[in-house]
């Protein structure tokens, strides 16, 4: 499959740079995978699409203030973006202006450069940094000196709204550098209304890394190697999924990260035994993949040629997806992290589709 097959022209005016102040008022496109029919709604109308006995699964990761600045021993400034918290005092991070930074290099952070970090390892394009602090842990230091990193295409200054609205209302476990954006549309009244309707709600954790914004650099998408991310799917969630399916209910995944977490767990030995699945995953889902768990997916409108739109194509079908995106452009839906949402049901014929135009 060619990377160019997943390209489309997107007017810059449709890229959303600001969040919806009232989360659930964003626009919602509904597409049924088996028919390709499209309906235009508001996100709070999603309650009409979900039935009593269905199970919604959300990603409860929390975005950390992963961007902060420091100084090299030479006095040169660096920008650090945390990729992963490795331990009490260690982080894995990318460093801008990393020239002359090697194992053993010292970097100073915080007020009057009082926090010292040492580069103790280099892994691909990332550096492992050890903080020399006997009081605060790495996450404490990050919380004190860092800022929430908005997606790289948003060039404006961050504001107080971003601090709140670039997190989900059900965030719990710290570790992401980007929000699970499909979940941003849920507010507490909507979650309560779903619960009152008899919809079950549970959570997985997948900490989203910087790789979510990295472009594919291969012409043939099958040659792409996905970045690795930490994932947790509890035994109780696995048991709930099996029980829901057995009773005829549907599994609704909120976000591509949730779907990837569930598929990763499904292919593990822990799934058959209903054990906790705690691991790293680099699962790459693209057309031809046969989905095993999720019946409906809530997701945003994604970048051209991204792994995210490839996942959507695998779930909804290539022709359906491209038709939905063309319809979204014509109807001026907002795209990307702060944009509008889709509710799509699984097209079981998608793996067999000859999608190349």
Curated annotation (Swiss-Prot):
- Highest rank taxon of the organism: Bacteria
Q: Write out the GO cellular component annotations.
A: cytoplasm
Q: What pathway is this protein said to act in by its record?
A: tRNA modification; tRNA-queuosine biosynthesis
Q: Name one GO molecular function term.
A: S-adenosylmethionine:tRNA ribosyltransferase-isomerase activity
How it assembles, according to the record, is: Monomer.
What PANTHER family does the entry give?
S-ADENOSYLMETHIONINE:TRNA RIBOSYLTRANSFERASE-ISOMERASE (PTHR30307:SF0)
What is the protein's given name? S-adenosylmethionine:tRNA ribosyltransferase-isomerase
Provide the species name. Buchnera aphidicola subsp. Acyrthosiphon pisum (strain APS)
